[in-house]
Amino acid sequence: MTAASHVGHLRFGFPESKPHTSNEPYVFIQATRQNWTGNIFIDSESQEVSGSNPQRQDYALGPYRAPGFSGYFVSRFSQPFASYGITHGASLQANTTEGTGEHLGAWVKFDSSCNEVEVRTGVSFVSIAQARKNLDIEAPSSVSFDDAVETLKEAWLEKLDRVQIEGVNETAAEYDQRTIFYTGLFHGLQYPSDFSEPLETIEGGRRTWYEGYTDQVREGEDSYYQSWSIWVGHRYAIRVFPDMLTPNRTLSVLNTACLHFSRRNASTV
């Protein structure tokens, strides 16, 4: 498994099927759970499964609702579908290509001779079309799984290598101070997260995002950040060090904070 900013890239290996058995290789995708109505679509010609889900974990934290919020996905498979169908609760609907409701899912099966399948899943908070665009931009067919693994490694090593540690006493492996430090730095560099999505290319160009304060989709020239550490003030203070290592995004983060203030007329920092 590897990833890009808005794409997950998975490689599934299937054991060889035994003769006279029905152990066909398959992948199942859960689209919605109880009390949440979503959609799912199967396109066997393009070898894609797509859908949407309005569930969000913070829905019970306050009176505000976001009727325009949904998470969208497009999963593209490297092998053709031998068969497929929709699950709706306990109901199995073979050869059905779309569904709407709770407890919704989809399965796709492959030829019994298939022993490996790659799945590239683009995600978006804007639309299914944008999820597909994210997939095409960040994980085109020309980029192999192994290429994606190396690109992700290089991206993180470039950031973590900005700090070099010397003179640390070696201790037991599970208490190695360097491991603890770099793990904390890795976690710190993930937030606040860039919530915007590319409209043209990975680097540069206009971007789009879902804005929770207005429950609308927006566009702009800059990135838009979310996932702030605002529960307790000292947690944001801890963020100063990771932010010092990424000065290229500081202006965008501050612009987003000002935008949040203007939208809600209340400071977020």
What are these regions (language model features)?
Residues 152, 232, 249-253:
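Stable alpha-helical elements in mature extracytoplasmic
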